[in-house]
Regions:
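Solvent-exposed, well-ordered amphipathic alpha-helical segments
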Residues: 14-30, 47-51, 76-90, 113-117, ...
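Short, low-complexity, polar/charged sequence segments that are solvent-exposed and flexible
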Residues: 34-37, 110-115, 137-142
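Hydrophobic ligand-binding cavity/cleft-lining segments
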Residues: 1-71
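Short amphipathic alpha-helical segments, especially helix-boundary/capping motifs
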Residues: 2-5, 85-87, 129
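Surface-exposed beta-strand edges and their flanking turn/coil or helix-capping segments
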Residues: 30, 104-108, 131-135
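A conserved amphipathic terminal alpha-helix motif
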Residues: 125-161
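Hydrophobic-ligand binding "helix-grip"
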Residues: 40-49, 61-115, 123-125
């Protein structure tokens, strides 16, 4: 039985978040070397031992006033080693849901830290393939962006001077 390549193809969506601010690069390197502030370190992925694996919560801020705080979702964040390239610190970053993983997006990208900003740039796969892509266009992209904004704000608190 043949499968249609279009139905098995992984659909991803670009996601880029930039947070301007004054970043202490030495503090960022220190924070990226010990991730206990981000969550509970867990076993490294066997297929990518250079990554550090952290169990944490990702926040979705609710901005319409209907909730007093963010919605939280247990997640695993993978971070590669911090590499200094000129005036930038570059770190591979990925995350996925810690439970019901097929129902939530999976992100992979790069974190770029400079003295003036923090940039998260990558792609995520919406859940449930092409249907998820349609849902993403209607609503889920907003959820993904707010979640990424909240994570970058959390990183900024650890990095900024």
């Amino acid at each position: 039985m043949e499968t249609d390549a279009a139905t098995t193809e992984l659909v991803t969506v670009p996601l880029r978040v930039r947070r301007p601010g004054t970043v202490d690069l030495d503090r960022a390197i220190l924070a990226l070397s010990d991730l206990s502030w981000l969550g509970r370190p867990t076993d490294r992925p066997r297929d990518r031992p250079q990554l550090r694996h952290v169990a944490t919560d990702l926040d979705l801020p609710i901005l319409d006033g209907s909730s007093t705080g963010p919605v939280r979702k247990a997640a695993f964040i993978d971070l590669g080693p911090a590499r200094q390239v000129g005036d930038l610190i570059l770190v591979e970053i990925a995350w996925r849901s810690a439970s019901f993983a097929p129902l939530f997006p999976v992100f992979a990208g790069q974190l770029s830290v400079s003295a003036n900003d923090i940039v998260l740039d990558g792609r995520y796969a919406p859940p449930v393939g092409r249907l998820g892509l349609l849902l993403d266009q209607a609503l889920l992209h907003l959820v993904a962006r707010r979640t990424a904004d909240a994570l970058v704000a959390r990183l900024a608190m650890a990095f900024e001077s």
